[in-house]
Amino acid sequence: ERILVSGDNRHVSYNEPKAMQEYLVTHAVAPQDVVVDYAGRSTYETCMRAKDVFGLQRAVLVSQGYHLPRALYIANSLGLDSVGMAGDLRLKPKADYQSVREWAAEVKAFLNLKYFPPDVLLGDMKPIK
């Protein structure tokens, strides 16, 4: 089994996949078991790339609990058979910026999946074995 970490790294000071990789390696995951995707700029793109670049058919998505329903909706709608696991203990977001952002992201996910699929940087296949 391998772990695919994917996220945004468009800015020099912001590198989600590198931070995830470093965390896993410092917590006893062998470096060769961590596959890094630097082009997952959104949940939609991460799921498309997991399927179309890394050749995954099934996945366990690990994310914040409040984010999981949207991530699973996107992954399964794109044909990536997925289940989820919350990586935090926060049961419900507070009525703050994050919950407003998540609501907007849910609307965007629906529109992307039904009407306006975004361009996804795919590239060559790199199947995970």
Predicted features, each with a name:
Residues 1-99:
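A structural signal for short, hydrophobic/glycine-enriched beta-strand patches
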Residues 96-122:
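A transmembrane-helix-recognition feature enriched in membrane-embedded lipid enzymes
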